[in-house]
Amino acid sequence: MQDNVPASGGGPSRLFILRPVATTLLMIAILLAGIIGYRALPVSALPEVDYPTIQVITLYPGASPDVVTSAITAPLERQFGQMSGLKQMSTQSAGGASVITLQFQLELSLDVAEQDVQAAINAASNLLPNDLPYPPTYSKVNPADPPIMTLAVTSSAMSMTQVQDMVDNRIAQKISQVAGVGLVSLAGGQRPAVRVRLNAPALAAYGLTSETIRTAITAANVNSAKGSLDGPTRSVTLSANDQMKSVDDYRKLIVAWKNGAPVRLQDVATIEQAAENIYLGAWANRQQAIIINVQRQPGANVITTTDSINKMLPALKASLPNSVEVATLTDRTTSIRASVKDVQFELLLAIALVVMVIYLFLRNAVATLIPSIAVPLSLVGTFAAMYFLGFSINNLTLMALTIATGFVVDDAIVVIENIARYIEKGEKPLNAALKGAGEIGFTIISLTFSLIAVLIPLLFMGDIVGRLFREFAVTLAVSILISAVVSLTLTPMMCARMLSHQSLRKQNRFTRASERFFTRLIDTYGTWLRKVLNHPWLTLSVALGTLLLTILLYIWIPKGFFPIQDNGIIQGTVQAPQTVSFSNMADRQQRVASIIMKDPTVESVSSFIGVDGTNAALNSGRLQINLKPLSERSERIPEIISRLQQQTAQIPGIQLYLQPVQDLTIDTQISRTQYQFTLQAMSLDELSVWVPKLMTELKKLPQLEDVSSDWQDGAAVAYVNVDRDSASRLGITMSQVDSALYNAFGQRLVSTIYTQASQYRVVLEHDTTNNTGLDALNDVRLISSDGGTIPLSSIATIEERQGPLAINHIDQFPSTTISFNVASGYALGEAVDAITQAEQQMNLPADITTRFQGSTLAFQSALSSTVWLIVAAIVAMYIVLGVLYESFIHPITILSTLPTAGVGALLALMMAGKDLDVIAIIGIILLIGIVKKNAIMMIDFALAAEREQGMKPYDAIYQACLLRFRPILMTTMAALLSALPLMLSTGVGAELRQPLGVCMVGGLIMSQILTLFTTPVIYLLFDRLATRFRRVPRQEEETE
């Protein structure tokens, strides 16, 4: 065969056609590299695009929100505000806790941010209260990111304090050591402690005060260095019985001497082993439990981290007593694996559909095999590049590969169809391969680089959305590039070796019937094409109409950000009146959980109340609802949420907010709903005036539902108004007053019990069992300058006021966050417009600033760049095509096909009830790259016919349209069917994939119908314009 090789022809494919062994080995190398890369790639729901985020928590039991703000939050804010790379700082100061969330720029390393945070905490430490029981602690975690795993620890025989001790020492620490874990928090924590409840009448009878008791306990229990004795022959370490470690030790403690007799602590107080904080509670399916919430570090892989935890769980469970049970309530990887598995199935289905299309068009098993090999080679080879680029197997990269299935086969189809045409004309396979590949090589290069050019703007998208789609764009671009290489190397080589005139001429009933069908179809197309070419202005009017309709549809269509996914987990917040007590809140929380547990779609419920780093106020309770797998329920999350809210509405005095857990978390604040809008002012007084007014207006908007605010200024405050003159006359200072109140009502941590494994606190408080109202303040007694004790009521009056339940700041200024969901039947864009309009109509003062947060802010950013992104894609493609064709005119002809795809995509979205979200926008951008393929194939052949055969433009474009009709139809069908599984997907995470499929299918159908007619007409129009412009200079020369 080599002896009959033509001296020229084949273009870039010639070397590979003539060297089949080298070509085969090269393809095997690509395949093996891809397989190795696939096995090493991590799996995740989405690309890792988290902002570097650190949460700083400072606990100050008993402190009011005002005290926490001024004494803790403000000093820390000032230091954190000086850090470089800080994007936003949000703080929440509640009774007993300060929570500061620091979000850094995407480019900043989390480890660098951690060092800056530690340095800022050290710098602020001297400004913090001296009696702060715990120093500020930080975690590399986004508090708004739901836990990747939730465990419930229960026991039928042990108390919750004993269970907590085991969880602390045996489970939580081990899980914290797992790579990727950012924070292990214990909800409903019942840390063991010795609680000293003072009996006010007994104290008064002995003439003692709480300060006397606190001083005695502090002095009696110490743990400090004592030194050693170093003698001539030996050394002795000094030790003493300076620690009290048991409840009995504290009961026997002498706190004073009266009339020569000792007064022991048990004489004036009840001492018991109990929980450090009695105002915390957690339940798993209504059974009291310790809830372990595991949150990942920003950027950590969910599946890798969770797998590591699951591997150690059996050993951890084995170390616990038989009466202690550890149950996994939530495992986020379940839905992630199911979602990825569904996309993998859709990828395989797309491959099968594409191969079926190839066979239907080529009607030959051998001819079908050749382009079919291009699909796995291109897709599998892409995994190698993904590995070296640090990507993961996730929903977006698998979606890119699914869409690429239709793309990667296009080039091979074009090549094999052109080679087969020469073989059918009588050429030998080798000559046909060289001629066909050489003739089509430039077209393949044009198709490839113009399609990749469309993806380039995606790489320059800013912020988190750009990071999110970078893996999508690069994965798709790499697969297209590999497919071009395969199509120019392996495909023509296989055609030269496997195709023959006899194999292509094999006939059966199916091939004869399909041949007659395609012949009639081409004849019908040719007839209509003649009519269209003879009435160009009508066709041009249709083309112009599609452009105008595209603009109108873009304006009309509802716009969203990111599809709401059904991952089988619902987060809930139970809101009660601001004056609710702990026991009352616990009862309400349990009633809500009971109703939810009865729902047939619910598998488990975990809930907790109390103020800690996760929950900001006593009147808020948290819920995590785990639904049954999607295969075991017929309803989606929106229907379930609506039903649960209706069922719990019967409980008086509570409001239940529910939202589905999403794979993408952009927010940094724990919110009751999906979207947030913030107001910021110079003072709390201004916010107190305008927040209620704005809330009233927003609740009227039909586009919104579940409107709520974290502004809570109706908490009951017992204001102690001290007569300073009287206090001074009696020798009593304000420091004594504060200390006495703290001793009585602040769960004050007055001492620490040290053991070999951990430390436990001694908690001091008044026993208010028989006196729970404001009258309990009358039991507080103070020591006067003469050594006697006087009641607080003798120097102070008590009045009940209202005050803040929590104080929020954003970037050091007072703020409030309004949360909302988008009402059914509306899109996020409509909700944002409605809020903006309502805000403008209110004429807020100039010193009150507003802005959207989290997902809503990202939506605004993405929406503002959408038009420019599409324009950039078109410009990039024009530049590439202009360079390839060395023409200003032909790229415009090719780009004229784009409005038809836009009309089809937007109409399909509206018919399917989908918003124009970022996933749909990506689909439209891909359509820009796909639909121009039809025009490129037509124009390439028309230009070749004009140049090589001397045809007139009319005849050249007409012949090109007929010759390329079958491959155009074949490639369009392949691309359409590759998107069809995404459009029809129903599994876990289908909401994420459907908009892309709908856009692709709708756009391809519309563009296929119209561009077969509009492209040749526009080609002839621009050819006439170009001819006319060329004549003008000639006429000027003749005139001269």
Swiss-Prot record:
It is a multi-pass membrane protein. InterPro entries: AcrB_DN_DC_subdom, Acrflvin-R, Multidrug-R_MdtB. The keyword Cell inner membrane applies. It is found in: Cell inner membrane. Gene3D superfamilies: Multidrug efflux transporter AcrB pore domain, Multidrug efflux transporter AcrB pore domain like, Multidrug efflux transporter AcrB TolC docking domain, DN and DC subdomains, Multidrug efflux transporter AcrB transmembrane domain. The keyword Cell membrane applies. The chain crosses the membrane at residues 15-37, 343-365, 369-391, 398-420, 440-462, 474-496, 535-557, 867-889, 909-931, 968-990, 1000-1022. GO terms for cellular component: plasma membrane. It holds the Pfam family ACR_tran. Keywords: Cell inner membrane, Cell membrane, Membrane, Transmembrane, Transmembrane helix, Transport. Its main location: membrane. GO terms for molecular function: xenobiotic transmembrane transporter activity. HAMAP family: MdtB. NCBIfam families: PRK10503.1, RND_permease_2. Part of a tripartite efflux system composed of MdtA, MdtB and MdtC. MdtB forms a heteromultimer with MdtC. PANTHER family: MULTIDRUG RESISTANCE PROTEIN MDTB, PTHR32063. This is Multidrug resistance protein MdtB. It comes from Pectobacterium atrosepticum (strain SCRI 1043 / ATCC BAA-672) (Erwinia carotovora subsp. atroseptica).
